[in-house]
Amino acid sequence: MILKLMAGILLLTVCLEGCSSQHWSYGLRPGGKRNTEHLVESFQEMGKEVDQMAEPQHFECTVHWPRSPLRDLRGALESLIEEEARQKKM
């Protein structure tokens, strides 16, 4: 009972903390008001970020995984099942 109560209080605290926080970016001030002196600069920054996101990014996997023994076992079982199915058809 005490464990459930503590977990509930912890969950409530985390939720309230997340809901009460405010994200400020691109010249926003408390209350959602923009700094009008730097408004053009804010939009230019946003435009640059959008252009950067539009460029495709290519990633290559450089990790070579060793051959899994489970994969070999699966292949052997599949071939046995196929062979038995062919023998039953004959």
Curated annotation (Swiss-Prot):
Main location: secreted
GO molecular function: gonadotropin hormone-releasing hormone activity
Modified residues (Pyrrolidone carboxylic acid): 22
Gene Ontology cellular component list: axon terminus; cytoplasmic side of rough endoplasmic reticulum membrane; dendrite; extracellular space; Golgi-associated vesicle; neurosecretory vesicle; perikaryon
Reported function: Stimulates the secretion of gonadotropins; it stimulates the secretion of both luteinizing and follicle-stimulating hormones.
Family: Belongs to the GnRH family.
Protein name as it appears in the record: Progonadoliberin-1
Organism, as annotated: Mus musculus (Mouse)
